[in-house]
Every structure is written in C-alpha cells, then in structure tokens.
Regions:
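Hydrophobic anchor at the beta1->P-loop junction of P-loop NTPases
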Residues: 8
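Walker A (P-loop) phosphate-binding loop of P-loop NTPases
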Residues: 13
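Conserved lysine of the Walker
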Residues: 16
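Hydrophobic positions on the alpha1 helix immediately C-terminal to the Walker A/P-loop
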Residues: 19, 23
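Conserved substrate/cofactor phosphate-moiety recognition/catalytic segment
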Residues: 24-69
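Glycine-rich phosphate-binding loop used to anchor ATP phosphates in small-molecule kinases
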Residues: 56-116
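A glycine- and Lys/Arg-enriched "phosphate-lid" helix/loop adjacent to the NTP-binding pocket
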Residues: 90-157
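NTP-dependent small-molecule kinase module
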Residues: 137-205
Length: 205
C-alpha cells in the first residue's frame, strides 16, 4: 500500500510549518512511519524570481522529486509542507493573472498523475490579512497586504472549493500551536484510517 499523503497549505504565517513539525513528532511517537517533504519555496534559486510562475515551476519539479522518493520509501504517512495542490493553486492564480495558461496547468496536474503522486488529505490553515502581517512583523517585499488578500480570496476562498479531495480548513487566529496540533492530529488519524480501509477493499477486489 502506498503512503497516505497529507498536504499543508494556507495563508502565510498561519502555522503550516510549525504544525508539520509538531505532527511529525507526535505521529512517530504513536508508531507511524512518517515521511516529510519540506517547503521548496525557501530554496528557490536566485535565477527564478520569488512569487513568479517560473519559480512555481521549479518548486513543482522539486516537490515532485521529493514526493516520488517518499512514496517509494517505507512510509505510512507523508507530510508535505506545500505540495501538489499548492502548486496547482498557484498555477490557477497565475492563469487568472495571464501569466500561465490553463493548458500548462493541466499538464502539470497530468504529470503528477503519471508518476503516481496524489494528495489524499488537505490541511488548509488560514488567518485574516491583518493577523498575517502582525505575525510577520510587517509587510514584506513579496508577501504584502495585496498578496495575502489575493491568496485568501482566490486560493482559500475560490480554488480549494473546486478541489475534490478530503480537506479541513482551520482558522488559527485565536488558537495556540498546541490547540491546532491536537485538532489536526485527530483529523489526520481519522482520515488515515479511512484511507487504509479503502485501500484494503481495493486490494481484495
């Protein structure tokens, strides 16, 4: 049975990376074999502008490589800090801006399908624009008010609704990291149990 892939995405500063680290530790303590795919946005080469469609293509390829390694490893669960769905979400946004075609976006989606990489469960963490800016300590050059508002409106508000994958959406504004962790741990274990049951049924057919 291939591993259960859980992808984290969401508003900047909503707690994605912190949640991934905490959940990985807890799941391993419970006996799960856990893989991790770190966010590739932090290592984009200088030749690709951060926040550009070309930069997103590079991140897509890097994420695909790491995911392909993990699904062929001995894992029960793979936690992904921004992966397939996040990449497709940005393609959707760049297409709306006229920077990327829907045809190219579909090619990217087909590529993931061709190599057998599929997100099984989405964890979308969100916070309001003002809270994101507060947690960052101010607006950045790329991650500014306009960027965050567009992300929450287009990706959290519109794109995710069209994605036919089991998901949870959690506003972390008034929650501590521990509260977020505890809630997500239960949601992930519940979804993983269903995944195992469905996989076992398919193998018996």
């Amino acid at each position: 049975m291939r591993p259960f892939i859980v992808e984290f995405l969401g508003t900047p500063e909503a707690g994605k990376t912190t949640s991934v680290k905490m959940l990985r530790r807890s799941l391993e303590e419970k006996g799960y074999k856990v893989g991790l795919v770190r966010e590739s946005a932090e290592i984009v080469p200088d030749m690709f502008k951060t926040g550009s469609s070309k930069g997103n293509i590079w991140m897509t390829l890097k994420t695909a490589q790491k995911l392909y390694e993990e699904i062929n490893n001995d894992r029960d669960i793979v936690l992904v800090d921004r992966g397939i769905v996040d990449s497709l979400a940005w393609n959707y946004l760049y297409a709306k801006r006229g920077e990327f075609s829907e045809e190219k976006s579909k090619c990217a989606e087909n590529f993931f399908e061709a190599i057998g990489v599929k997100t099984d469960f989405i964890v979308a963490l969100t916070i309001p624009t003002e809270e994101s800016i507060r947690r960052r300590g101010g607006e950045g050059h790329v991650v500014n008010r306009k960027f965050i508002e567009e992300f929450n409106r287009e990706i959290i508000g519109n794109f995710l609704k069209s994605v036919e994958i089991d998901k949870v959406l959690l506003n972390t504004e008034s929650k501590t990291p521990v509260e977020v962790h505890d809630w997500l741990l239960g949601a992930i274990e519940e979804s993983y149990a269903k995944f195992k049951e469905n996989s076992a049924s398919k193998e018996e057919e």
